[in-house]
Amino acid sequence: IYLKSYIHGFFIFSMLINPVDLLLWTFRRNENDVVKLYDALSPIMEVSTGGDMLNFGFWDETTLHPVDAQKRLCEMMGDMAQISSAEIIADIGSGILGPAKIWNSQYPSLQISSVNVNFSQLASVEPSNISKLNSTARMLPFSNSSLDRVIALESAQHFKPIGDFFSESNRVLKDDGILALAIPTATENSNLSNLGILKF
């Protein structure tokens, strides 16, 4: 299958994706399948949106561009997770750190650890004051009761079994800590053209 991104009147990117791989991604068996999926699709998603986030975002009638929807979702997650009152957070399944960069710019004193099973995504990001940890969501690399917030922004749907992630989040969160999740959904009346980065 050839995928092309159409931005500002130009075809920017063309890539061959094996249809068998596409089918196998639908029936992910383990974390390596998710890594392969994002290794193949991340460049397309970045070029298609012009941004550094890999989420669908939050769309409404006023949303005009995928990057606007993505930024809006990050800000909403930050508000819902109450990161303004947090000191130490972990962004699990962090991709290429787009959301963490937004939160870091809004809250410079916030200590952010980005946890991702995909080493190549972490390695592709320029060094910053955001900690990058290559680890699975099933065994979080934090001590007991050490985090104020655990955030999984459109990543928890990949954590298999998700119960392990919930147990680990409970272990690493302080007693008053918050686990915040955003999982992509579509309503029956969703317009497929608004899927932005994944409308192929």
Give each language-model segment a name.
Residues 138-150:
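A short acidic, Gly/Pro-enriched loop at the edge of an enzyme's catalytic core
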Residues 13-47:
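N-terminal auxiliary segments of SAM/dcSAM-dependent transferases
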Residues 163-178:
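A short glycine-rich, Lys/Arg-flanked "PGG" loop and its adjoining helix->strand segment in the class I
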Residues 149-161:
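A short SAM/SAH-binding and catalytic strip from SAM-dependent methyltransferases
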Residues 64-85:
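Conserved alpha-helix/loop element of class I SAM-dependent methyltransferases that forms part
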Residues 178-200:
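Conserved class I S-adenosyl-L-methionine
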Residues 88-139:
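Class I SAM-dependent methyltransferase SAM/SAH-binding core
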